[in-house]
Amino acid sequence: MTKPKFNIPYLGLHSSFILAIATSITATPVAANSNFGKIELSPGFTREKGRVTGYTKGSFPLHTMGKRDRQGNPCTGFAAPTPDHILILEKDFPRLQLQVDSGDDTTLFIQGPNDRTIRCGDDTGRNKDASIVDNAWKAGLYRIWIGTFKQNVQSNYSLYIKE
């Protein structure tokens, strides 16, 4: 047996197994860091690509990540600590609209494409479901939380994203 380099002992098959487990734990894909997966959109996307579903549930206060968004809108509601969806914009969008459809009192919290940019939404007119309409969406990764105005309310929803 040859002397190991860097004075690291040879551990054989066991070290390969440990390395494989460590790699799989640390190399978790982005979609695994959300409750309901990822959405990848390019300009001109179809209506089907812009619709996802999930359900609300949680007691994590969304305002702890930001009290107000970049437009001065208050950030409210409760959700799970993990984002519900990961949105990947492959190119810049001049305008996007995100609309929750649940029939309940929902809220929206979107963080991205950097940790400092926040967009929040609450009621839409007379409708208690949340929506956000905003301009200048840069290409990148966005974390989306769908919350409810009250803690631990479970409600099925559809999220519609439109240009």
Task: Label each residue range with its predicted role.
Residues 66-95:
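Non-catalytic, beta-strand-enriched accessory regions in extracellular/secretory proteins
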Residues 86-102, 108-109, 142-146:
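Hydrophobic beta-strand segments within beta-rich accessory/binding domains
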Residues 30-67:
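Predominantly extracellular/luminal regions of secreted and cell-surface proteins
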Residues 109-160:
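Noncatalytic accessory or regulatory domains flanking protease catalytic cores in secreted, cell-surface
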Residues 2-16:
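Bacterial N-terminal signal peptides that target proteins for export
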Residues 16-23:
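Classic N-terminal secretory signal peptides
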Residues 40, 86-88, 99, 133-135, ...:
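Generic structural detector for well-ordered beta-strands
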